[in-house]
A protein has these predicted regions:
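Extended, charged catalytic domains and RNA/DNA-binding interfaces, predominantly
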Residues: 1-272
């Protein structure tokens, strides 16, 4: 919508850098990085405009709902039973600033039957517990889904905290809600591994393997604790030893996060190949 200069959304000043962005599309790593940078600035401006009241929420919902329906249709169109499995899903992002409660979750639905017309976004709440509440309500309506935290390595310690999003204690309600909605966590991807960090695993000679270590945010220990899977498992076991429930009993997945809709094993043109 922002790229389409004929749309109402494109008339806002924050949309101008996005105008005609799709007229020329390249799959080079440099193009992907450029588009990513533009989108980050755009997303921040959209959120600020909404918070200030200068952006009409009805217009945002109209654009979001249209995009969501296209996503569902794309999943249905590409689904080939027994050959190629697709899911409708979207990314829920709580923050746009690295290491400042930078929380991302991929919300994936079991199938496309009776999906909601409108998805839950950061404009509804930046608190992941509110996302889980929304997922629970949808589940009661027969719509099953799961959320997968990803890129936890740059969450600033918020991904696997010893308190809830608002700083309160982790109680039984929080634990059951999290375990029910987030049975998986992404452990590695193109933007660095989330398994562990050299500062957290000093006796592991492989702790720096594909870890982000050169960003200033990685020099602050408080940004690391609560951001990595090994540390999360340890924190969960510590809570269990104290007689408390463990919110960090989860399986793991690996991803590309190259945003090109495919794996590097299928085509030489994907950015993951270019990065290699």
């Amino acid at each position: 919508e922002a790229a389409d200069t004929s749309s109402e959304f494109s008339k806002y000043d924050f949309s101008e850098p996005m105008h005609d962005l799709n007229e020329t599309v390249s799959n080079s790593i440099f193009s992907i990085l450029k588009r990513s940078g533009l989108f980050r600035t755009f997303a921040r401006a959209v959120n600020e405009s909404y918070q200030e009241g200068s952006l009409d929420r009805n217009l945002v919902d109209k654009v979001a709902n249209s995009t969501w329906q296209k996503t569902i249709n794309a999943a249905d169109d590409a689904y080939k039973p027994g050959i190629f499995t697709t899911f409708a899903g979207y990314e829920y992002t709580s923050s746009v600033d690295l290491y400042d409660r930078y929380l991302h979750r991929n919300v994936i639905f079991k199938d496309t039957k009776n999906l909601p017309d409108r998805i839950f976004s950061r404009l509804d709440s930046q608190d992941p517990e509110e996302l889980w509440n929304w997922m629970d309500i949808r589940r009661e309506e027969g719509v099953e889904s799961l959320a997968i935290p990803h890129n936890s390595n740059i969450s600033g310690g918020a991904a696997f905290s010893m308190s809830d999003y608002n700083g309160g204690p982790i109680d039984e309600t929080y634990v059951s809600k999290r375990l029910r909605n987030e049975p998986l966590v992404e452990i590695t991807q193109a933007k660095g591994t989330s398994e562990t960090h050299p500062f957290l695993s000093k006796n592991d000679e492989w702790a720096n393997f594909e870890a982000i270590t050169n960003h200033p945010g990685e020099k602050i220990l408080s940004n690391l604790k609560g951001s990595y899977v090994r540390d999360a498992y340890l924190r969960g076991l510590t809570l269990a030893e104290q007689g408390l429930s463990n919110p960090y009993k989860f399986g793991i997945i690996g991803s590309s996060d190259t945003h090109v809709g495919g794996g590097s094993y299928t085509c030489l043109l994907y950015t993951s190949d270019a990065a290699d």
